Amino acid sequence: MRGNVGFYGYAAGPTVHIVDYYALADPLLARLPAKTKWRIGHFVRIMPAGYPETIQARSNQIPDSDLATYYDHLHLVTSGPLWSAARLKMIVRMNLGRDEYLVARYVDRLKAAGYQ
């Protein structure tokens, strides 16, 4: 996990997966709200529990059921078989905002736990 992944990611090569906590290159983190203290271009996200393990294991390890479901749907869109019917249906579903409530409930739980 690190920020400013451009040069580092290039130098690390194609076999290294870097979780970008600024969310510039991460589909899940880019859809989560930024922490309250930020500066332009540096919107740090709270790293969801189980997310680094999910990336490493290549299977969903996120304990929050709403965020885990959202991740599964998003992963199908971003990494599923290109022309599969399931992926195309999920693209429509996500573009219509039908899964936004999953992120909203996750964020509500974060706020209730004291995260800002």
Predicted segments with their positions:
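C-terminal luminal/periplasmic domains and tails of membrane-associated envelope-modifying transferases
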Residues: 1-116
